[in-house]
Amino acid sequence: MVNEEKYTYGINHEDIKTDDNSVIVLCEDEKEAGIINDRKEKGLIGVCKYQPAYQLLGSITRQIPDRTQRVEDITRYIGVYGFNSTLRVTLAMVIAAAYSKKGRTLFINLDEFSGIEHIMMSDGCSNLSDVFYMFKQAGEHFTQQIRECIKANELFDYIPAVVCADDISYVNDRLISGLLDELAHNLKYDYIVVNISEGINKPWSIMGRCSNVYISDSGDYIENCRFNNLKRYFIESGKEAIVDRMMRINLKMKDTMDEGFLKRIMYTDAYGYVSSLLDMV
């Protein structure tokens, strides 16, 4: 964002281009802004600077969609949440496998104690703890080092879970959202499936970013009450949109869980059931 005089006389235009090749010029009046906009030069937007802040921001956002909207046009975030962590991570793996048949999928596990390190193998050198550290060190930007932390199985890509619970409990929701956006923007996944732990700060902030939120359901009475409390919180705090995107799933898991689970996941009753539900979404 630059003022009109500096844009016209004082700078090399290439030096101020942003990642999406856009420049906002603050003009003295609407006439000058109109002249700039009439050129229809890609990435160049003129706005009058003499207006209330909320109107100024509105003028900009109407013409340049924000980064989150652009990313989500390409990548859909799929959230998995629940009050039984074992059921939740199982459902998350099944969801990731099902979405992998729809497009390129990345699985991110935000559990403090994942329990699936032998199912989704790591090379022992890099995991989500390292990714958070690299992301912060790089000023919250994607790097080649982060790319090298991503592993793959026959179905989807994944980042091995943290090895230290503090690496999840201390990270804030803004950092997680920023990491998701950078992964989506740079790697162009169709879907990023996120196992949303209760251990992270403000899990509903991550849910709010998701196109769909699947809730694991064991059928337990207290768990059902907790789910109702969660819905009430969303409604009373103005987050009804999250409720509209939520779906509870009771896997009624009959399949054996062991190190070879992912190799046979497509032949399990759980996968068949979830796939049939996704076909209706």
Locations of the language-model features?
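Short, well-ordered secondary-structure micro-motifs within conserved domains or adaptor modules
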Residues: 1-35, 211-215
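Short, well-ordered alpha-helix to beta-strand connector turns
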Residues: 7, 20-22, 42-43, 102-103, ...
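Extreme N-terminal, non-catalytic leader segments
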Residues: 22-77
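Walker A/P-loop phosphate-binding motif and the immediately C-terminal alpha-helix
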Residues: 74-116
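Phosphate-binding loop that captures ATP/GTP phosphates
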Residues: 102-158
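Cytosolic-facing regulatory segments adjacent to core modules
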Residues: 138-152, 160-196
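Conserved catalytic-core segment of NTP-binding enzymes
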Residues: 177-268
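NTP-binding/hydrolysis catalytic cores, primarily Walker-type P-loop NTPases
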Residues: 262-281
